[in-house]
């Protein structure tokens, strides 16, 4: 699969992450190991880990996706929103608000 094809599949996964089962964890972690520099793959990994509430593992790929200017705005926005949920889970309301502000600023 080409890089563009991987990005399309990864972004489709980000959009449909609600309710994904644990069987997806191994798949996205394998994709992350195989393509660690691809922002769309990081976005998908972070989204799946966040959906499973694996916040510690989700933080790094979500931060990478949120901050990558090559990634589509909607995927960056979703990453910032997931980071806001993570901050809320940790009781860091100031960080949660900052993440929501950054999510709103995405095009």
What are these regions (language model features)?
Residues 1-6, 63-67, 85-107:
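TPR/TPR-like (Sel1-like) alpha-helical repeat modules
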Residues 2-72:
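Alpha-helical adaptor scaffolds
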Residues 47, 84-85:
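Generic anion/oxyanion-binding catalytic loop in active/binding sites
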Residues 74-78:
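C-terminal soluble interaction/assembly domains
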Residues 79-83:
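Small/polar glycine-rich anion-binding or flexible loop at a beta-alpha turn
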């Amino acid at each position: 699969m080409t890089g563009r094809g991987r990005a399309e599949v990864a972004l489709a996964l980000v959009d449909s992450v609600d309710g994904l089962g644990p069987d997806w964890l191994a798949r996205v972690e394998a994709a992350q190991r195989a393509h660690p520099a691809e922002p769309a793959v990081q976005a998908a990994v972070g989204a799946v880990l966040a959906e499973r509430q694996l916040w510690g593992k989700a933080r790094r790929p979500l931060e990478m996706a949120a901050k990558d200017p090559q990634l589509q705005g909607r995927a960056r926005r979703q990453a910032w929103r997931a980071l806001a949920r993570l901050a809320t889970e940790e009781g860091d309301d100031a960080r949660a608000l900052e993440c929501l502000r950054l999510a709103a600023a995405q095009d």
